[in-house]
Curated annotation (Swiss-Prot):
Its cofactor is Mg(2+). Keywords: Acyltransferase, Cell shape, Cell wall biogenesis/degradation, Cytoplasm, Magnesium, Metal-binding, Multifunctional enzyme, Nucleotidyltransferase, Peptidoglycan synthesis, Repeat, Transferase. InterPro entries: Bifunctional_GlmU, GlmU-like, GlmU_C_LbH, Hexapep, Hexapep_transf_CS, MobA-like_NTP_Trfase, Nucleotide-diphossugar_trans, Trimer_LpxA-like_sf. It comes from Shewanella oneidensis (strain ATCC 700550 / JCM 31522 / CIP 106686 / LMG 19005 / NCIMB 14063 / MR-1). This is Bifunctional protein GlmU. Binds 1 Mg(2+) ion per subunit. NCBIfam families: glmU, PRK09451.1. Its EC number is 2.7.7.23, 2.3.1.157. SUPFAM superfamilies: Nucleotide-diphospho-sugar transferases (SSF53448), Trimeric LpxA-like enzymes (SSF51161).
């Protein structure tokens, strides 16, 4: 029995006041619908039907080449009509799981519980109890059993008092779904084909209907405007921050951290305020991350430190390495064990060897730097000739004086010393001292010009 997921994503989202389709608005730098797609994949879906309408080109360009079946709903005539568009891709023996592209926080564990609750030949619906159920369809029960769902606009006063509401998420057998959708009517206050009407049909047909509930109501909340979108963003961030703390991280203020990807932490990690994580970030034990740091697709080993306001992207930090404050590691940068870069140092496609240091004001690009090297302030690897990038090699125990330019391709041998202010254009041998700056002159009796009075 295959798991066939139908994701409804056809709405325009007028209240968003945006040209972007509603489901493409982001939570943690990922579209709402992508969150739903990822969750569907995580529970082992065999097929995903994406029912779309408004903004087709933007949807397809954003979601790209994913394992999706694209189903056009040319007219938006209700949720039942939307699901009906996917019927040609649904087999009788499928379990059909219906999800919503603007409900991004639904958890895999909740969907697994819903699927487990579905009887072999029956239906399972996800419900939630709300203190204020205004706007939601009410779950109607008789002697504890679900007999139907009534929408807010069609409910009588007794039904409006019900606190258990429909989330719209349900698991239905494929053959029964086809039968019930064929029987839908739009004879209601909205003039739409309600998917929820199939629950009353199931009851009338003697089909068993079970329910499940999410751990938190926030899982099933959607976003119809930017205020609600921001609320979902905060809820998502709170959930991700909690995961980090449970895994072993101390967050200075859990409400002031942004997680926009997958972050793995070791034990005794200290994270200060206003840190942003993007992409895949792996953090070892006893790592310290200072305030305002931005860390993207990076691996950080045990005992490393990222000081405040550093930007680290596509980089690796070895054991006890440190960067910052105000440092920048660009893709391909690596700090080996005990290596250090300080304020206003930038590295790209460069390796700084074990125990080597670049304390301040340097650019190290396309460089292989050995162990025990000192990079003076103002050092620049001149790696670009206007057309191609070239490699600078600095071997172990080299001392590079301040304000030195190394014009690549160039190799500096072990133990060499480069005098401050030098421009190095040729290879330097081991243990050599190289000074290329102009010889200092002393002009005695020099008369400094004075300002002419007007």
């Amino acid at each position: 029995m295959a798991l066939n997921v139908v994701i409804l994503a056809a709405g325009k989202g007028t209240r968003m006041r945006s040209d972007l389709p509603k489901v493409l608005h982001p939570i943690a730098h990922k579209s709402m619908v992508q969150h739903v797609i990822d969750t569907a994949h995580s529970i082992g879906s065999d097929a995903i039907q994406l029912v779309y309408g408004y903004g087709a080109d933007k949807l397809k360009s954003t979601l790209g080449e994913q394992k999706l079946n694209w189903i056009l709903q040319a007219e938006q005539l209700g949720t039942g009509h939307a699901v009906a568009q996917a019927i040609p891709n649904i087999d009788d023996n499928d379990t059909v799981l219906i999800l919503y592209g603007d409900v991004p926080l639904i958890q895999a564990s909740t969907l697994e519980a819903l699927l487990a609750a579905r009887p072999e030949y029956g239906v399972a619906i996800l419900t939630v109890n709300l203190a204020n159920p205004m706007g939601y369809g009410r779950i109607v029960r008789e002697q504890g059993k679900v007999v139907g769902i009534v929408e807010q606009k069609d409910a009588n006063p007794e039904q409006l008092a019900i606190n258990e509401v429909n989330t719209g998420i349900m698991a239905v057998p494929g053959n029964a779904l086809k039968t019930w959708l064929d029987r839908l009517s739009n004879n209601n206050a909205q003039g739409e084909y309600y998917l929820t009407d199939i629950i009353a049909m199931a009851h009338a047909d003697g089909v068993e209907i079970n329910t499940a509930q999410p751990q938190s109501a926030i899982e099933v909340e959607g976003a119809n405007n930017r205020v609600q979108l921001a609320q979902l963003e905060r809820a998502y961030q709170a959930r991700e921050a909690e995961k980090l703390m449970i895994a072993g991280a101390n967050l200075r203020d859990p409400s002031r951290i942004d997680i926009r990807g997958e972050v793995t932490v070791g034990m005794d990690v200290m994270i200060d305020v206003n840190v942003i994580f993007e992409g895949k970030v792996v953090i070892g034990n006893n790592v310290t991350i200072g305030a305002g740091a931005i860390i993207i697709d990076t691996e950080i080993a045990d005992n490393a430190e990222i000081k405040p306001y550093s930007i680290i992207e596509g980089a690796k930090l070895g054991v006890a390495a440190s960067a910052g404050p105000f440092a920048r590691l660009r893709p391909g940068a690596e700090l080996m064990q005990d290596a250090h870069i300080g304020n206003f140092v930038e590295m790209k496609k460069a390796v700084l060897g074990v125990g080597s240091k670049a304390g301040h004001l340097a650019y190290l690009g396309d460089a292989q730097i050995g162990a025990g090297v000192n990079i003076g302030a103002g050092t620049i690897t001149c790696n670009y000739d206007g057309a191609n990038k070239h490699l600078t090699v600095i071997e172990d125990n080299v001392f590079v004086g301040s304000d030195t330019q190394l014009v690549a391709p160039v190799t500096i041998g072990k133990g060499a010393t480069l005098g401050a202010g030098s421009t190095i254009t040729r290879d330097v041998g081991e243990d050599e001292l190289v000074i290329t700056r102009v010889k200092q002159k002393h002009l005695t009796g020099w008369q400094r010009p004075v300002k002419i009075k007007k």
